[in-house]
Regions:
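Active-site environment of non-heme Fe oxygenases that use a 2-His-1-carboxylate facial triad
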Residues: 2-13, 126-158, 162-168, 173-174, ...
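Motif-centric detector for short Cys/His coordination patterns
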Residues: 1-151
Length: 408
């Protein structure tokens, strides 16, 4: 290991490896240092940001790689006394002594600074951008083998990238033993709990349908139109995995519709409907003994305002208009057209889940449903929810790890 290899671990305030990207020049600009590379790319580094990201000296804890400086401690006394470049092109800053302390010298890894200059530190980095689809552009979800997802990081990476890009994928040839889904979920991240439990069943069972903790129309044989789960929550689950254990029933085909495609269609052809659906609020309410989850929001909910809005569209729990009386009529009209569009063959995929298939989808973007099925023959699925943060975190980690493996 070279001296520079040793410096990589010491200078980067996180746990990633950064290839050296020697800095060409550094200049002062008011309260910032401007770092420049030979290709002309620049990064402005405010002195407080540099001080917070100093390894040691009260900035970044070398063990946890997390900041330990309380912002209240930032002061005008934190001034840069000198700056230059090391022999290998890293940024070196000497700080004015603070009180009785000796002057601190901070070194910042050139590759770490470069990755910030390129925007690789942003939330959307290291994950694919969403691709909108409809029934003519996506004939079926991409498929991945269960055993490979569990054992091969490259396959896991491909599976998560498909899931984030399209909002849906299928994992096939999984064991049909109850509980296997928890092993697949553990490969990705923690499962999100709900009143249904960490792992829940979907089957036509009058006891499940009426139980205090499992009461839902999903546990009947009724048709379920395109919908998303748990709109009754402030933040609905990000992703849902449904594992088919048995499917001997007549009917019960699964459906998928990309909510992002519906939003594009509405904006292009019915902008008034889009405005109504994204601003008029409804109360979503879980009915059940001992259960009272409720939340008020529009059908197309911008939530954080970035990316694809959250679709809140589960009519069994959409209970009350929460809008001026004068708006209710047009809200119902827009709602009727929206659900008809979601069920339109131009947008909806229809297919049959077989034993061992696991349907994975973005619960806030992709609307799922099923056709009605008869009481003859068994149909048993198990499901889990995983929050978006966990999917994104693991996707970034495996994408960065694959990139590192492919870097000479």
């Amino acid at each position: 290991m070279t001296q520079h290899d040793l410096s990589v671990a010491l200078l980067a305030p996180d746990f990633y490896h950064y290839a050296p990207s020697p800095i060409a020049a550094v200049t002062a600009n008011d309260d910032a240092l401007v770092v420049s590379w030979p290709d002309g790319r620049q990064l402005s580094c405010h002195r407080f940001w540099l001080r917070e990201n100093t390894l040691g000296h009260g900035g970044i804890d070398p063990a946890t790689r997390e900041g330990i400086m309380d912002p209240a401690e930032l002061s005008d006394a934190m001034q840069i006394a000198a700056f230059d470049l090391t022999d290998v092109g890293d940024l070196r800053v000497t700080w004015v002594p603070e009180g009785a302390d000796e002057s601190a010298v901070s070194t910042y890894h050139s590759g770490w600074l470069r990755h910030i200059a390129e925007g690789q530190h942003l939330p959307e980095s290291w994950v694919p951008a969403p691709e909108v689809w409809n029934a003519s552009t996506l004939s079926q979800p991409p498929r991945h083998q269960a055993d490979a997802v569990l054992t091969d990081d490259d396959v896991l990476c491909d599976m998560l990238n498909d899931l984030l890009r399209l909002g849906v994928c299928l994992v096939e040839r999984a064991p049909t033993e109850p509980g296997f889904l928890t092993a697949l979920a553990a490969r990705i991240g923690p499962v999100r709990d709900s009143n249904f439990g960490l792992l829940w069943d979907v089957k036509a069972d009058v006891n499940l349908a009426g139980d205090a903790k499992t009461n839902t129309t999903a546990n009947t044989g009724f048709r379920l139109g395109p919908h998303t789960d748990l709109p009754t929550r402030e933040i609905p689950p990000g992703f849902q995995f449904l594992h088919c254990l048995i499917n001997e029933a007549d009917g019960g085909e699964s459906t998928l519709t990309d909510g992002a495609a519906l939003i594009e269609e509405l904006k292009a052809t019915r902008p008034d409907d889009y405005e109504i659906l994204s601003t008029r609020r409804w109360v979503f309410f879980n009915r059940g003994p001992g259960i009272d989850h409720r939340f008020s929001a529009p059908i197309i909910d911008p939530l954080g305002g970035e990316g694809v809005p959250t679709i809140r569209a589960f009519y069994p729990v959409r209970a009350f208009p929460d809008m001026p009386d004068a708006d209710v009529g047009e809200a119902y009209a827009a709602l009727r057209r929206f659900h008809a569009l979601a069920d339109d063959p131009r947008f909806e995929l229809t297919f049959q889940l077989g034993p061992g298939d696991i349907m994975c989808f973005d619960n806030r973007r992709v609307m799922h449903g099923r056709k009605a099925f008869s009481g003859s023959g068994q149909r048993h699925l198990q499901g889990v929810y995983i929050d978006r943060d966990e999917i994104l975190s693991t996707a970034r980690a495996v994408n960065r790890a694959r990139a590192a493996r492919q870097t000479p």
